[in-house]
């Protein structure tokens, strides 16, 4: 079972990725983790990637695709894998296809931007401990204060509305063409495209996924 996950930041992708991994016994392949591991191990591709990163440039699709090919040849990917954060562009999707990596399911989590902004902008953090709260879904006992220490809670830079909206714009610009691309692939019978309502309860979304992939 080879799966690609698509969904905006804050759409609940990470939570459902965990569920799919545990339910179907397949590893999650994150390009960031792979890059770090290859650089640490000093592999040929890792050395190439390090040179590019040290020069302050973006790692090329060829290097990333090479890493993915190496990674999915490992024993734990025998039953399949979950690709998270890749592909992000049409050339990357084409690259996977050219390498003969067929994808069984493309899963999209659909959540309106305003809902994501509300989810993210409502987050509050106690930085010293890493504890997080949400003004609506998981409020602290005393507004603006950490439950344990009583210290002030803050809004992280990443959770501020303007930051969230900027990230969403990037996501839509990059991913809208991919959604269309995989829609066409599905229409041609080359993959299955599944879209889930990410505004439902986490357990409901998980149940919907389990049913669709059964």
UniProtKB/Swiss-Prot annotation:
Pathway(s) served: Purine metabolism; AMP biosynthesis via salvage pathway; AMP from ADP: step 1/1
Positions with a binding annotation for AMP: 31, 36, 57-59, 85-88, 92, 156, 167
InterPro entries on file: Adenyl_kin_sub, Adenylat/UMP-CMP_kin, Adenylat_kinase_CS, Adenylate_kinase_lid-dom, P-loop_NTPase
Family: Belongs to the adenylate kinase family.
Keywords: ATP-binding, Cytoplasm, Kinase, Nucleotide biosynthesis, Nucleotide-binding, Transferase
Superkingdom to which the source organism belongs: Bacteria
Single GO cellular component term: cytoplasm
HAMAP family with a match to the protein in the record: Adenylate_kinase_Adk (MF_00235)
Protein name (Swiss-Prot/TrEMBL): Adenylate kinase
Enzyme class: transferase
SUBUNIT field: Monomer.
Organism of this sequence: Vibrio cholerae serotype O1 (strain ATCC 39315 / El Tor Inaba N16961)
Positions of ATP binding: 10-15, 123, 132-133, 200
Function, as annotated: Catalyzes the reversible transfer of the terminal phosphate group between ATP and AMP. Plays an important role in cellular energy homeostasis and in adenine nucleotide metabolism.
GO molecular function annotations of the record: adenylate kinase activity; ATP binding; nucleoside diphosphate kinase activity
Entry comment, domain topic: Consists of three domains, a large central CORE domain and two small peripheral domains, NMPbind and LID, which undergo movements during catalysis. The LID domain closes over the site of phosphoryl transfer upon ATP binding. Assembling and dissambling the active center during each catalytic cycle provides an effective means to prevent ATP hydrolysis.
The reaction(s) this protein catalyses: AMP + ATP = 2 ADP
NMP, as annotated region: 30-59
EC number(s) on file: 2.7.4.3
Pfam families linked to this entry: ADK, ADK_lid
Principal location: cytoplasm
GO-annotated biological processes: AMP salvage; nucleoside diphosphate metabolic process; nucleoside monophosphate metabolic process
């Amino acid at each position: 079972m080879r799966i690609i996950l698509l969904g905006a930041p804050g759409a609940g992708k990470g939570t459902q990725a965990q569920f799919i991994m545990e339910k179907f016994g397949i590893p999650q392949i994150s390009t960031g983790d792979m890059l770090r591991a290859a650089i640490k191990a000093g592999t040929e591709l890792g050395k190439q990637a390090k040179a590019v990163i040290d020069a302050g440039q973006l790692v090329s699709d060829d290097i990333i695709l090479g890493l993915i090919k190496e990674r999915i040849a490992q024993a734990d990917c025998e039953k399949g894998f979950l690709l998270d954060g890749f592909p992000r562009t049409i050339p990357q999707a084409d690259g996977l296809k050219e390498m003969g990596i067929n994808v069984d399911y493309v899963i999209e989590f659909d959540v309106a931007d305003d809902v994501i902004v509300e989810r993210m902008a409502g987050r509050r953090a106690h930085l010293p401990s890493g504890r997080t709260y949400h003004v609506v879904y998981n409020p602290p006992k005393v507004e603006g204060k950490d439950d344990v220490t009583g210290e002030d809670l803050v809004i992280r830079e990443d959770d501020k509305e303007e930051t969230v909206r900027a990230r969403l714009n990037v996501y839509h610009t990059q991913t809208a063409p991919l959604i269309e691309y995989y829609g066409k692939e599905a229409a041609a019978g080359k993959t299955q495209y599944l879209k889930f309502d990410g505004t439902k309860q986490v357990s409901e979304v998980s149940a919907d996924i389990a049913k669709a992939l059964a």
